[in-house]
């Protein structure tokens, strides 16, 4: 009887000893593998110059901080450049290989093939509805047209500045603008905007709040409208909501990774809404050439000087980024 109990205890102790030995052996093997792997990673990290691809990933929204690539010092190898041009440019050039030619010319200025993107838009009005500025640096070419001067000015004001915007429910609420930086921005296929200022008794000043036909018309069938009214006064609004969206926006400051190059015209457009301030012409430039090849040649020649006036931002800028700040 005692012999059986002693044998059982001895087997139990032997099993524990063997299990402990096996666990220690496995631990030593795993430590050896992990340490060797880490050693190889450390050695390779000192040899290979890794690029942080996350720097150029598109991000929906808007961030103020400028991000620098910590693993590469070459300014253009980790940057992207978008050049936006009207469709009339490609129609005039009429060459299926012209983009490849332009890409090779940018290469002579230090911009590798694949880092420059040429993006076409139909016209100023169409570009205003859905501006998409995804690159680290964005250059927008605008052909001057005296009949579209105000449209060009509004578009430049939109893309050259950072806006914090919120949706507006104009069927339920009255709205007022608090200061000069506060604007109402409408975009869509057809925007007609009417306003009715209200007194302290919420009665219309020169209009009837129940009759939109008596409202003051500030825009008619436009694709982009930046509305500025008297600050501190409530307004009842009427907008063609079926084809247009209006938002209450606050201008936060310049969007420094965007520049506008005006093609033609006697003077650079002034996009400043406040008549008492100095004209805003930062990151607005002018090129006077009749032919589009001449325009593109000049852009290539001065591209590196132009981006010195800009700041690289690692973010994607589409229409939602203009309107919703993250």
Swiss-Prot record:
It is found in: Virion; Host endoplasmic reticulum lumen. Keywords: Calcium, Capsid protein, Disulfide bond, Glycoprotein, Host endoplasmic reticulum, Host-virus interaction, Metal-binding, Outer capsid protein, Signal, T=13 icosahedral capsid protein, Virion. One of its GO terms (molecular function) is metal ion binding. Residues 1-50 form the signal peptide. It comes from the Viruses. GO terms for cellular component: host cell endoplasmic reticulum lumen; T=13 icosahedral viral capsid; viral outer capsid. InterPro entries: VP7, VP7_1, VP7_2. Residues 165-167 are annotated as: CNP motif. Transmembrane segments: none annotated. Pfam families: VP7 (PF00434). Disulfide bonds join 82-135, 165-249, 191-244, 196-207. Gene3D superfamilies: Glycoprotein VP7, domain 1, Rotavirus outer-layer protein VP7, domain 2. Ca(2+) 1 binds at residues 95, 206, 214, 216. The keyword Nucleus does not apply. Glycans are attached at residues 238, 318. Residues 253-255 are annotated as: GPR motif. The keyword Glycoprotein applies. N-glycosylated. Ca(2+) 2 binds at residues 177, 228-229, 231, 301. Calcium-binding protein that interacts with rotavirus cell receptors once the initial attachment by VP4 has been achieved. Rotavirus attachment and entry into the host cell probably involves multiple sequential contacts between the outer capsid proteins VP4 and VP7, and the cell receptors. Following entry into the host cell, low intracellular or intravesicular Ca(2+) concentration probably causes the calcium-stabilized VP7 trimers to dissociate from the virion. This step is probably necessary for the membrane-disrupting entry step and the release of VP4, which is locked onto the virion by VP7. Some rotavirus strains are neuraminidase-sensitive and require sialic acid to attach to the cell surface. Some rotavirus strains are integrin-dependent. Some rotavirus strains depend on ganglioside for their entry into the host cell. Hsp70 also seems to be involved in the entry of some strains. Homotrimer; disulfide-linked. 2 Ca(2+) ions bound at each subunit interface in the trimer hold the trimer together. Interacts with the intermediate capsid protein VP6. Interacts with the outer capsid protein VP5*. HAMAP family: Rota_VP7 (MF_04130), Rota_VP7_A (MF_04131). Belongs to the rotavirus VP7 family. This is Outer capsid glycoprotein VP7. The lineage of its organism: Viruses, Riboviria, Orthornavirae, Duplornaviricota, Resentoviricetes.
